[in-house]
Amino acid sequence: KKFEYLKGGKLSYKELENLPVMCLEGSTSTRKYVEDYLAERGTFVRPEFELATSDMLIQFAVRNLGVASVVSDFAEKYIENGELFILKFDKAIPEREFCIVSNERAPMSAAAEKLYDFLLVP
């Protein structure tokens, strides 16, 4: 495993500038959130790959093509079986908060209900 040497230690965000970072495409709110957080701390990364989905980021990471930022739930099975691991930083990125707005007079689609249920799970 190419990045095994990073396992178990704590990194500074600045160290990301020297790693092959993989990100979601630039138009996503998640990408903007992470970039803004890093920029506030003086860290600017140039992604090796910009991919459309978290699933793609996970698959590239499994193949040791770089390090990626994804919601841990999406990578849970890969983390549990040891194919991936979570990088530890000297300061954690704060969790994001979401607000859900719905119309009580209009039923939610099946996809909206699934997202709603997912976001409500603690």
Predicted regions located by residue number:
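Secondary-structure junction motif
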Residues: 5-7, 13, 20-41, 108-112, ...
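Short Pro/Gly-enriched coil loops immediately N-terminal to beta-strands
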Residues: 1, 9, 13-17, 89-97
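Short, well-ordered alpha-helical scaffold segment located
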Residues: 2-4, 74
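Hydrophobic hinge/microswitch elements
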Residues: 30-86
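A late-sequence structural motif
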Residues: 87-122
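Short beta->alpha junction loops/turns
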Residues: 26-27, 50-54, 91, 105
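Active-site-adjacent beta-strand anchor residues
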Residues: 23-24, 50, 68, 101
